[in-house]
């Protein structure tokens, strides 16, 4: 169910204003749906999203498309370091309403804040059948180990880690996180693998052009290797 090598990201799915500001261009809802259907028809069924993607419209689009073959990966994002009991459940219930579904295939702790409290809530929701698998995103090795320890106590597997990784961003390979995932049979999901198109020869636009401009220096060693 959750074993897939290519994940369809939906960070740019949303209103035209969001896409234009973030990436300098936008596509219609109809085009997004056609793209999703094409991906599913070719075996790419896992779609990764979050409540804050597309100014909140990304998840609503997924629910509106109502594609039964689509597998959904979404996230709980704690915007405050202070934990509030029930915050994970409240967020998931909103997500499920957006998706018009009774469960999500994978639920990630988007930021490693109040790890134990948030994962314990996820464990309850997992047992209730509202979550198919649990992961943690944007974490370091020690935080990943803590997450595994917490879930091991609950006899629930840590499904995966989702971090930034590409040819020019290999921090998690260098510091041992990727190897740890392999040794513990934990999936490692990489986001921004093409660096917003930089690794395909495209130039990012919109806000992304500012974010990725500082990374162009990292491309120089790659250019030398490629000749």
Language model: regions and residue ranges:
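Acidic-and-aromatic substrate-binding clefts and catalytic sites of carbohydrate-active enzymes
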Residues: 50-59, 79-85, 110-117, 141-142, ...
């Amino acid at each position: 169910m959750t074993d897939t090598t290519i994940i369809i990201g939906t960070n740019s799915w949303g209103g035209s204003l969001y896409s234009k500001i973030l990436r300098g261009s936008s596509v219609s809802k109809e085009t997004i749906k056609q793209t999703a259907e094409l991906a599913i028809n070719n075996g790419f069924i896992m779609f990764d999203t979050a409540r804050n993607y597309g100014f909140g419209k990304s998840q609503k689009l997924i629910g509106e498309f109502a594609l039964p073959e689509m597998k959904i990966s979404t996230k709980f994002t704690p915007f405050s370091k202070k934990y509030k009991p029930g915050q994970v459940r409240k967020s998931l219930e909103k997500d499920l309403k957006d998706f018009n579904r009774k469960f999500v295939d994978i639920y990630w702790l988007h930021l490693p804040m109040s790890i134990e409290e948030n994962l314990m809530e996820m464990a309850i929701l997992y047992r209730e059948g509202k979550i198919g698998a649990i992961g943690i995103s944007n974490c370091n090795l020690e935080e990943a180990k803590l997450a595994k320890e917490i879930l091991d106590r609950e006899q629930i597997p840590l499904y995966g880690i989702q971090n930034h990784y590409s040819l020019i961003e290999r921090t998690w390979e260098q510091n041992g996180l990727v190897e740890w995932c392999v040794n513990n049979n934990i999936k490692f999901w990489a986001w921004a693998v093409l660096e917003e198109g930089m690794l395909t020869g495209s130039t990012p636009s919109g806000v992304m052009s500012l974010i990725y401009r500082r990374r162009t220096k990292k491309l120089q060693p790659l250019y030398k290797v490629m000749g």
